[in-house]
């Protein structure tokens, strides 16, 4: 499968995950899909009345990947309905940086067909890292 087609599939999975979001307070629904090897893992934001306990879609997808034994992320897609598309928050970017390098492709998909292609390094140029890559394999 070509890179463009693979990224299209990743975006479609993120958009499908967005439909499963629980966002009764803000109405802001986000879905995410991460690729690790040949597998894809999805997540959606899950709000809580205590906003600080809300789980972001990107972190939910990363947690699903880690629970399945994945440690090296190859790409991520984030879907919202905003124009322009909404990037991951700082906590999500730092979580992605725990399992990927700055070259991680990040596709942001928004409303009215809007789309942004970027990298983790462009979104978080100075990620905090304390573990060397060989220790991150778990």
Regions found by a protein language model. Give the residues of each.
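C-terminal binding/interaction regions
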Residues: 2-20, 70-138
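Stable alpha-helical structural segments in soluble proteins, enriched in small hydrophobic residues
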Residues: 14-17, 57, 61
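Short Gly/Pro-enriched turn/cap motifs at secondary-structure boundaries
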Residues: 22-25
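Short beta-strand scaffold segments in enzyme catalytic cores
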Residues: 27-37
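Short acidic-glycine loop/turn motifs at beta-strand connectors
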Residues: 36-39, 110-112
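Glycine/charged-rich beta-loop-alpha catalytic/anionic-binding loops adjacent to active sites
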Residues: 37-48, 72-76
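Alpha-helix C-terminal capping segments
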Residues: 64-69
